[in-house]
């Protein structure tokens, strides 16, 4: 197996005195989709947010262990968190377009990072919208408000906005749970296409979705990572009975 993109060693995470993650060890492979599954409150979203330090924004949290991105500990004191979040971006559960035009949503990140050339920005906007399978639907109305898009289009816009800053890793926290079935299918097709260029980690409550879109699956329960393997093995021949019980609907 190739060198992992992200390596997690003995990760523990605390909200105050509450230990939300317990000795998590995991290797996330590059150019693959890794799904995180488990019942509500199991720690999967907390774990996802440790991967680009979004939990830093919460008072009273602390962490032990290490998370290595291409061999570098992202919690080392010298790490630039803004630069980290450019490399490891997040797509949230509900679409959150900025109250500005479609064009300006996509150009927002590149402008922050110093790109001012109109020609360069035009190219980034077009490439990003094409990568997010949205260009054909919005090419004629780039100056219109992004808030006028449908929910599914808004979520693909948010993915395009993330791709515009050229991340290496894309984190997705239930990216289609607020969408209708047709929009969900488009997001799943997009995830499949994006893994050629990006490493993707997705939290989902939808077991069928995890089985459809992911190459690897990690099952979390009560803050522990119970089992991690290729998705086909997790869903057909899990080693741990707790995994089998969850997947077959005996609890969750």
UniProtKB/Swiss-Prot annotation:
Sorted alphabetically, the keyword list is: ATP-binding, Cell membrane, Membrane, Nucleotide-binding, Phosphate transport, Translocase, Transport
What this chain does, per the entry, is described as: Part of the ABC transporter complex PstSACB involved in phosphate import. Responsible for energy coupling to the transport system.
Q: Any one Gene Ontology biological process term?
A: phosphate ion transmembrane transport
Query: Would you identify the family this protein belongs to, as annotated?
Result: Belongs to the ABC transporter superfamily. Phosphate importer (TC 3.A.1.7) family.
Its main localization is: membrane
Instruction: Look up the EC number in the record and give it.
Output: 7.3.2.1
Catalysed conversion reaction: phosphate(out) + ATP + H2O = ADP + 2 phosphate(in) + H(+)
Q: Which PROSITE patterns is this protein grouped with?
A: ABC_TRANSPORTER_1, ABC_TRANSPORTER_2, PSTB
| Residue ranges of domain ABC transporter in the record | 6-247
Provide the membrane topology annotation. Answer: Peripheral membrane protein
Gene name of the encoded protein: pstB
Q: Which organism is it from?
A: Moorella thermoacetica (strain ATCC 39073 / JCM 9320)
Alphabetical list of InterPro entries matching this protein = AAA+_ATPase, ABC_transporter-like_ATP-bd, ABC_transporter-like_CS, P-loop_NTPase, PstB-like
Protein residues bound to ATP:
38-45
The terms describing its cellular component in GO are: plasma membrane
Protein's cellular compartments = Cell membrane
* Single annotated GO MF: ATPase-coupled phosphate ion transmembrane transporter activity
Which is an annotated Pfam family here? ABC_tran
**Name used for this protein in its record:** Phosphate import ATP-binding protein PstB
Please describe the quaternary structure of this protein: The complex is composed of two ATP-binding proteins (PstB), two transmembrane proteins (PstC and PstA) and a solute-binding protein (PstS).
């Amino acid at each position: 197996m190739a060198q992992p993109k992200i390596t997690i060693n003995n990760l523990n995470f605390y909200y105050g005195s509450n230990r939300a993650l317990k000795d998590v060890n995991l290797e996330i492979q590059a150019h693959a989709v890794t799904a995180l599954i488990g019942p509500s409150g199991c720690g999967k979203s907390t774990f996802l947010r440790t991967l680009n330090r979004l939990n830093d924004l919460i008072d009273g949290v602390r962490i032990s262990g290490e998370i290595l991105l291409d061999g570098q500990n992202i919690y080392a004191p010298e790490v630039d968190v803004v630069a980290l979040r450019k490399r490891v971006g997040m797509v949230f559960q509900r679409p959150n377009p900025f109250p500005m035009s479609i064009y300006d949503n996509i150009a927002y990140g590149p402008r922050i990072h110093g790109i001012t050339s109109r020609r360069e920005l035009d190219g980034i906007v077009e490439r990003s919208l094409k990568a997010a399978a949205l260009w054909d639907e919005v090419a004629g109305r780039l100056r219109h408000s992004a808030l006028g898009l449908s929910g599914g289009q808004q979520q693909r816009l948010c993915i395009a906005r993330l791709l515009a800053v050229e991340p290496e890793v894309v984190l997705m926290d239930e990216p289609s749970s607020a969408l209708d079935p047709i929009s969900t299918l488009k997001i799943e097709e997009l995830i499949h296409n994006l893994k050629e260029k990006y490493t993707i980690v997705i939290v989902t409550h939808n077991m069928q979705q995890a089985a459809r879109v992911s190459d690897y699956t990690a099952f979390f329960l009560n803050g522990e990572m119970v089992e991690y393997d290729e998705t086909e093995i997790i869903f057909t021949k899990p080693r741990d009975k707790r995994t089998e019980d969850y997947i077959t609907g005996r609890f969750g």
